[in-house]
Amino acid sequence: MGDLELLLPGEAEVLVQGLHSFQLREMGSEGWSKQHENLEKLNMQAILDATVSQAEPIQELLVTHGKIPTLVEELIAVEMWKQKVFPVLCRLEDFKPQNTFPIYMVVHHEASIINLLETVFFHKEVCESADDTVLDLVDYCHRKLILLVARKGGGDLSEEERFQDSTPMQELQKQAEMMEFEISLKALSVLRYITDCMDSLSLSTLNRMLTTHNLPCLLVELLEHSPWSRREGGKLQHFESGRWQTVAPSEHQKLNKLDGQVWIALYNLLLSPEARTRYCLTNFAKGQLLKLQAFLTDTLLDQLPNLADLKSFLAHLALVETQPPKKDLVLEQIPEIWDRLERENKGKWQAIAKHQLQHVFSLSEKDLRQQAQRWAETYRLDVLEAVAPERPRCAYCSAEASKRCSRCQKVWYCCRECQVKHWEKHGKTCVLAAQGDRAK
């Protein structure tokens, strides 16, 4: 990777070895923040490994040192923090921070972890190294898919909502809502990679996917709703690379990545030998699955030829009798991370929020500058540009951008007018980042 190497092999191994779980009340603390920065470095290095070089040491290190279960636990812990503690913080009348960057880092932590898992779960040995926590990860992905199915609208805020006057905490809540959509889409990809490993999953995991959550039927609903597609001004748009992009008329029939992930997951869940002997084809399941026939066009089959087997399966399904729900007595494992964390912290959400208000999120200007300096060192511009899938976009209007903020060098704009309009939102972070750079 030459000059684009972010971490030396020895340095990456030290960071991986140091990964560990934190209690909910510790989120945002100094030690937690350091691990978050380390995770971001591992994240960027993993993307570089996957796109620039042949070797993929981050994935290998995570497997070797048994850290995939740690990442899964951290993922579910921050998900719980966002559901149980973050809303309490937002309601506290005596908490009106002028700078929400420390809280943003906790909110963003879930996105960082799921992004890393999406990058490395492509490899079967990573899924296998998750051990029992793959059950917890399946449940996590199921929760995110439910959010996608229930989602209404186009998946982001309107321009009026995005730029209307709001307090820093209200602004952070909007950002968290927009982030949740992207997190859920990445969870879909992780779930698809788990289904690639049907032959090595435990019976408990197979039962969780096929019976408890009935993922095949849920995926059919996802295809019907297609929350990553919308019509805007009469034009078709797909959500890709973190934003809505207009699809050229000549590309309308082209399969997008997220639809592809759903189809591959369906193929694995319905046609793998492990699934075919365990999935109970009830009247409801049959009715849902036969809806897929309308989507299996010749154009789609040209792009994913293996779906011809799924088409044959559905043609056969239409002719056979359905099965009554199975009532077998099965002794199986159940996910334990969410339940354990909830038991440990039940009735303490208010206390955790107040503790974090006093000891974690009320930082001095000096502490904020130091944090901004570490942030600037973590997000190296040359690496970010190397892993970016396309040219940068304007932070205000999302048009293609060619000019950076001259002060912090981290935010892009298409013109001076957009920069002026965005300054009210960007100003405080910009000043802190610039001060951090000068303090190096």
Curated annotation (Swiss-Prot):
This protein's name: Zinc finger MYND domain-containing protein 10
Q: Which residues form a coiled coil?
A: none
What Gene Ontology terms describe where this protein resides (cellular component)? apical plasma membrane; centriolar satellite; cytoplasm; dynein axonemal particle
Q: What is the lineage of its organism?
A: Eukaryota, Metazoa, Chordata, Craniata, Vertebrata
**InterPro entries attached here?**
UCP037948_Znf-MYND, ZMYND10, Znf_MYND
Tell me the disulfide pairings in this chain.
none
One Gene Ontology MF term: molecular adaptor activity
Q: Which UniProt keywords apply?
A: Cell membrane, Cytoplasm, Cytoskeleton, Membrane, Metal-binding, Zinc, Zinc-finger
UniProt lists the family membership as follows: Belongs to the ZMYND10 family.
> Which is a GO BP term held by this UniProt record?
inner dynein arm assembly
Zinc fingers (MYND-type), as residue ranges, are 394-430
Which residues take part in binding Zn(2+) 1? C394, C397, C414, C418
Record-annotated residues binding Zn(2+) 2?
A: C405, C408, H426, C430
Q: Which gene encodes it?
A: Zmynd10
